[in-house]
């Protein structure tokens, strides 16, 4: 398993007859599958006509730092509410943050296959008997709102690939006389992986995960749920995933000890296999030493279920639908500086829609409204300091023309509320915080985001000839290895595009760090040669893949050295889970005093996913609406909004 491996049982459990206790009569309660903490249906609040609330103080001045998906969502939902004095500041010359969709042919005017260098597979939290856009998630809501096209993601080990090749220990797993690549064909979605060793690992993983899913689904959002989740957290918050894998399995779950589901009971040899290639669908090694609550949240609560590839705001031919500024020569911020114009292809289309698509409530887009103001949207502007003033406003200092040091100018502006969406290491290393008292910003909060663990990640993408997926029957569509390249994905967006794509290497943490010294060109060459070597060494393959790959057009992304990110996903180590939760509590406990709102994946416990970005943005909007006495829609009040729980 990788961070985005498929585990679909949470989407099927309610359909397959699991007992589900009725949730409370609260219309804002979420349903399973969904994240475990608040059991709050954010979609129900956001999808209302006129949005979350109606502003009674529309001139309340709001600054949003970062134009990734979190910042863009916050800007759109605040504008829907009627707030009109919004300033969005972005350090780079593009929007989207770690939604980084790179055109495979940057100078082509024809629609073509993109490379998703950041997030690439999206859970919609839909159940098995409903389409993705009916999932009770904000991803489902925005995909429906913006008419995004999508398809099932071609995950290793899933039914959405023709076959998955598994190459471990130089092809010796399986006990053949010659090196072999094990071939996993899973057309029905329930076929176990090949080989006795892998099947033992698969059985132990599935027994643990299925049992936990059944019991969680039964009690989720019921009156007993909060106590059960607290018991689960108490049992596992200090346990690493490595230790969970080897922890003895339970014979049966005991309702008198509801948080204890035991472990997977794997032997050292089985754990080594699971570390290297999961159940044949990708390595979990990069996450072995993080708090086990992270992979449990990912698998059990729907983040791994029915994952989707976002094609963009496109028609069946893969061409963009009529959309704002699609044919503009350039787009400009409030100062007249240009930034990357929208293409509406790939996941970036989501971010582009958040900024450029008109809102029903206002008749114009966030972009159009921002352009009417001298400070509505500022790109190429790096925030350097936040200073609390005696009048309770926050002064935001930023360097304009950040990318041109010889022309950089320092500016500042004063705001009533400031939403910070940046990766936390950027906050620590780039932004000075001044005059914030302990009642506003406790040292415990600062320590929690300073000591957060940011994962490294490296992706190597390249164009792939159409003939590989159309005619090749020998080389598996997805390949999982214990080599330095690790996982290989190939997939198609559209028949009409001139080429497909190959994710030639996808690595995390130590596996990504060990590739850091190679130049992009060296790394691409090494990955192609290594994949050829593996395929030629496997007696049942004996064919190179490099003739299908556009090596010279390959693109490499290393997130830890990206100056706009300093990491790919924020995780947490054993014993630090409550530090991470405290960051999610900050907006409710301190923001009304400090004027600061922390939002997004950086301040969540579900690393590497887009849904917590949406929810963090909406959380900030809820609290700003509450602070400014906005009128909530749909009868919602803060008493309907659950609290995050720390240790009792």
Locate the predicted segments by residue:
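Mobile amphipathic helical/loop "lid" adjacent to a hydrophobic cofactor/ligand pocket
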Residues: 2-13, 24, 140, 144-146, ...
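Conserved flavin/dinucleotide-binding core of flavoenzymes
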Residues: 3-49, 81, 393, 413, ...
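N-terminal glycine-rich phosphate/pyrophosphate-binding loop and immediately adjacent elements
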Residues: 53-221
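Short, solvent-exposed loop/turn segments at secondary-structure junctions
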Residues: 69-70, 93-94, 106, 122, ...
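Mid-to-C-terminal "cap/lid" subdomains and adjacent gly/pro-rich loops that border
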Residues: 147, 161-231, 372, 421, ...
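Active-site/ligand-binding neighborhood in enzyme catalytic cores
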Residues: 217-385, 389-394, 400-404, 414, ...
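Mid-domain catalytic core of redox enzymes
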Residues: 379, 384-503, 507-510
């Amino acid at each position: 398993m990788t961070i985005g491996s498929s585990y679909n049982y949470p989407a099927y459990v309610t359909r397959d007859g699991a007992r589900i206790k009725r949730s409370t009569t609260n219309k804002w309660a979420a349903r399973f599958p969904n994240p475990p903490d608040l059991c709050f249906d954010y979609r129900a609040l956001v999808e209302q006509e006129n949005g979350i609330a109606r502003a009674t103080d529309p001139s309340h001045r709001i600054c949003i730092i970062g134009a990734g998906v979190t910042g863009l969502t916050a800007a759109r939902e605040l504008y829907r509410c009627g707030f009109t004095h919004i300033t969005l500041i972005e350090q780079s010359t593009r929007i989207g943050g770690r939604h980084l969709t790179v055109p495979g042919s940057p100078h082509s005017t024809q629609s073509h296959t993109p490379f998703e260098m950041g997030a690439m597979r999206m859970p919609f939290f839909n159940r098995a008997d409903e389409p993705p856009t009916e999932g009770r998630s904000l991803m489902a809501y925005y995909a429906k709102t913006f008419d995004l096209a999508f398809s099932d993601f071609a995950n290793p080990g899933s039914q959405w690939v023709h076959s998955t090749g598994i190459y471990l220990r130089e092809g010796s797993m399986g006990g053949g006389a010659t090196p072999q690549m094990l071939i996993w064909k899973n057309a029905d979605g329930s076929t176990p992986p090949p080989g006795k060793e892998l099947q033992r690992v698969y059985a132990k993983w599935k027994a643990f995960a299925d049992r936990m899913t059944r019991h969680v689904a039964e009690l989720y959002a019921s009156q007993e749920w909060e106590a059960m989740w607290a018991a689960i957290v108490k049992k596992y918050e200090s346990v690493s995933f490595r230790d969970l894998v080897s922890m003895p399995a339970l014979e049966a779950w005991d309702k008198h000890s509801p948080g204890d589901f035991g472990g997977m009971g794997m032997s050292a040899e089985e754990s080594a296999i699971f570390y290297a290639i999961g159940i044949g669908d990708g390595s979990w090694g990069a996450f072995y030493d993080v708090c086990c609550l992270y992979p449990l949240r990912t698998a059990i609560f729907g983040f791994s279920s029915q994952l989707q590839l976002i094609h963009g705001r496109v028609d069946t031919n893969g061409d963009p639908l009529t959309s704002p500024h699609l044919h503009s020569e350039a787009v400009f911020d409030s100062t007249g500086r240009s930034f990357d114009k929208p293409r509406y292809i790939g996941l970036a289309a989501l971010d582009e829609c958040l900024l450029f698509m008109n809102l029903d409530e206002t008749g114009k887009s966030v972009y159009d409204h921002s352009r009417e103001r001298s400070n509505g949207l500022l790109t190429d502007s790096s925030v350097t300091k936040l200073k609390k003033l005696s009048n309770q406003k926050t002064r935001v200092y930023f360097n304009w023309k950040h990318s041109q040091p010889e022309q950089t100018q320092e500016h500042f502006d004063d705001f009533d509320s400031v939403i910070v969406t940046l990766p936390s290491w950027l906050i620590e290393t780039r932004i000075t915080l001044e005059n914030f008292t302990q009642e506003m910003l406790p040292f415990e909060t600062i320590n929690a985001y300073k000591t957060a663990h940011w994962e490294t990640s490296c992706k190597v993408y390249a164009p792939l000839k159409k003939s590989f997926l159309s005619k090749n029957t020998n080389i598996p569509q997805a390949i999982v290895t214990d080599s330095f390249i690790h996982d290989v994905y190939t997939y198609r967006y559209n028949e009409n595009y001139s080429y497909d794509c190959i994710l030639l290497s996808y690595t995390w943490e130590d596996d990504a760090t060990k590739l850091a010294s190679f130049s992009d060109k060296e790394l691409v060459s090494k990955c192609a040669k290594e994949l050829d070597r593996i395929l030629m060494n496997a007696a049942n393959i004996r064919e190179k893949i490099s003739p299908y790959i556009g090596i010279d057009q390959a693109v490499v992304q290393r997130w830890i050295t990206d100056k706009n990110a300093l990491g790919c996903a924020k995780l947490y180590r054993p014993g630090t889970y409550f530090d991470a939760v405290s960051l999610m509590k900050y907006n409710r406990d301190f923001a009304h005093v400090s004027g600061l709102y922390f939002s997004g994946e950086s301040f969540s416990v579900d690393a590497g996913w887009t849904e917590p970005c949406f929810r963090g943005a909406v959380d900030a909007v809820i609290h700003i609406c509450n602070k400014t006495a906005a009128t909530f829609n749909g009868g919602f009040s803060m008493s309907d909004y659950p609290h995050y729980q720390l240790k009792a």
